[in-house]
Regions:
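Short hydrophobic/Thr-rich beta-strand motif most characteristic of the beta2 strand and flanking loop
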Residues: 32-39, 47
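Acidic catalytic/metal-coordinating carboxylates
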Residues: 40-43, 66-72
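Conserved acidic carboxylate
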Residues: 15
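Alpha4 helix (beta4-alpha4-beta5 surface) of REC/receiver domains from two-component response regulators
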Residues: 22, 66-69, 92-109, 116, ...
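C-terminal output helix
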Residues: 113-123, 130, 134
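Active-site beta3 strand of CheY-like receiver
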Residues: 51-57, 62
Length: 144
């Protein structure tokens, strides 16, 4: 992503369920975001390093490294530690939250999240990111 104030925010979706991942991708693209994808914990690290997303939408239940392992790796890698994460879980977020408390988690969403909650969580994460000194972003414009 460039540093231009007109740049779209880039979201990395880390979700192993193909249908859900593709549905989330369409919804976010329709809301004006640039989207990249990963299907497991290993890819979540390599894609984040290569693509430099502005926010990560992370499923906690992943093959090849659970979401908690991904959070721990992000926290310990200087080039990834400032990326805000929105956790997406099939469990009650109140149960997932204590396990992730020590990591930088901007928001929790329970599957299936409606589009309004999804976009609000991502925008909140982007505001958090800007407040913590990463490059300023312009939230995507409303779809026409």
């Amino acid at each position: 992503m460039s540093d231009s104030s007109t740049s779209k925010a880039k979201v990395l979706i880390v979700e192993d369920d193909d249908d859900l991942r593709h549905g989330l991708t369409r919804r976010l693209q329709n809301s004006g975001y640039e989207v990249v994808q990963a299907t497991d914990g290993v890819a979540a690290i390599s894609v984040a390093r290569h693509e430099r997303p502005d926010v990560v939408l992370l499923d906690l239940g992943l093959p090849a490294g659970s979401g908690l392992i991904v959070l721990e790796r992000y926290a310990n890698l200087p080039d990834l530690s400032t990326i805000p994460v929105v956790v997406l879980t099939g469990r009650d977020p109140r149960i997932a939250e204590p396990a992730t408390r020590k990591f930088h988690v901007a928001a929790f969403l329970q599957k299936p999240a409606d589009n309004k909650d999804l976009v609000e969580a991502i925008e909140r994460a982007l505001r958090t990111q800007t407040a913590h000194g990463r490059r300023p972003l312009t939230p995507p414009s409303e779809p026409t």
